[in-house]
Amino acid sequence: MEYITMRNGTKVPMLGLGCYKSEEQEGVEAVKSAIEIGYRHIDTANFYENEKYVGRGIRESGIDREKLFVVSKIWPTSFKTPEVAIEYSMRALNIDYIDMYLLHWPSQNEYARNHAFETLLKYKEKGYFKEVGVSNFKKEHLEKLKETFGFYPMMNQIEISPWLQKKEDYAFCQENDIVMTACVPFAKGNILNDPKLVEIAEKHGKNVGQVILRWNIQRGNCVIPK
């Protein structure tokens, strides 16, 4: 497993399991199987409505909690009362702490966004989270967050693939030491038949999925295929 070090010194496994639409027992088994074959980065969210299954999979795997990097997220509709969503995540996952808790989207309501982020920081101080970050934030959202709080978040999770490279966002995060996590790296499966990527994969004796994962990791991105 390869790791990237955030600016606070925390090492993050670069390859993770995305748990979107992993439901009930299927979700439990997916998490257990992923951990068994070496995954150490598990990503879920309030919006996915599967935190309790993800948490059960983690517990049933028997792995030491300290060996995992667990991520969850709060949906914008909860930004005005973030405490409710945070407490729900903790109860549903039923683990001692969450490694990274993210704002899932920036929301058009800047006041609510700032309130939610401030609340996440308070819960970090209480020991609920090791760190807090964001998801789907563009450069302007990140800059506004820094104007308000004096620092950039540790992580920004956004959709990235060879078809959707987000070059401006990528460059900005690289310049400001914000770890990027690439979600939907396979473009919902459509990219797996891309002729150029098929050619590259065949040349190296790999499949297209492996090529895309390596492309992200070599660029310094964490990547969370489903």
Residue ranges and their predicted role:
Residues 10-15, 38-41, 63-68, 95-99, ...:
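Short, well-ordered coil/turn segments that N-cap beta-strands
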Residues 17, 34, 42, 54, ...:
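Conserved, mostly hydrophobic/aromatic
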Residues 106-226:
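Beta/alpha (TIM)-barrel catalytic core signal, keyed to glycine-rich beta->alpha loops juxtaposed to Asp/Glu
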Residues 65-78, 99-106, 160:
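A short, structured active-site edge motif that brings together acidic residues
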Residues 83-103, 122-126, 147, 178:
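CE4/NodB-like, metal-dependent polysaccharide N-deacetylase domain
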Residues 22-35, 78-94, 112-115, 140-143, ...:
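Short, acidic/polar
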Residues 1-68, 119:
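N-terminal binding-site loop/beta-alpha segment at the start of enzyme catalytic domains
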Residues 22-25, 45-53, 75-81, 108-111, ...:
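Acidic-and-aromatic substrate-binding clefts and catalytic sites of carbohydrate-active enzymes
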